[in-house]
Amino acid sequence: MDDAIFKYKTLSEKVFTSKSNDPKATFDHMVLEREIKDVVATSVIGGQSPSIQLMDSRTDLCRTFVVATSRRAGGAVRLRSYGTRDADPFPASIWQAGRATSAAPTFFAPIEIDDVVYGDGGTGCNNPTKEAIAEAGNIWPNRAIGIVISIGTGLENALELKDEPTQLSNLAKFFLQNTSPKNVFKLTVAEYAVRCLTSCEMVHREISEHPDHDILDGNYFRLNVPQGMGTIGLAEWDKLKNMIALTNRYMEHGEIRESKRKMANLLRDPRRASRSL
């Protein structure tokens, strides 16, 4: 975890200060690719090769998947490092999977892998908790889930965008596109960000308010900083210290301390969940 945080600090500055030549993207996807490859090549599993495959048949490793969207077929695609009874591992390199799940519309250009164009998880899968629950059920159909921990990126204050329309009519967009394309692009980015934050919370509410008691019974947790994060933009890599301070303060709240205690107990003994069903 410490390595991941350190790598992100270095990567974020380089990636989010780049500029894209693509009018539909904010940042240069080539810089993102280069930085992901560097992380892979310098990792323990990379062995100095940036093109190591996502698939790993070793049974002692954690099973990992990320979510992307197939632009043509639509819907979420799970890019797995492992095979299941119904699907093979995703046939691509680690850096390609990283690019696919990072290709957020308006921020990075999509990536084509084996003639399929992938973007990020889209506004419906930026919170992939349901995907994770479904995946666990597919792999271990007869086992109870011990614990689910969902980690958010902060809650947005909707009033911060009150002076800007969150949706434009087609006529208004056409007019702006021909008179001020930069402004319409900025509004598109704002719309996307609001949809992402809204969809993430919708998934959380669906799970917490309507849990399947055969799967989740007091073992679902969501950690999400409620205030302050909404003012920090994706490109503001230089505000990581602010994010850390806000998160540390949030994690010390009494309610969160109690949640941490419960999570620690379940992580130490996941069988507690099975016995409680």
Predicted regions and their residues:
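Conserved catalytic cores and adjacent C-terminal regulatory segments
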Residues: 1-277
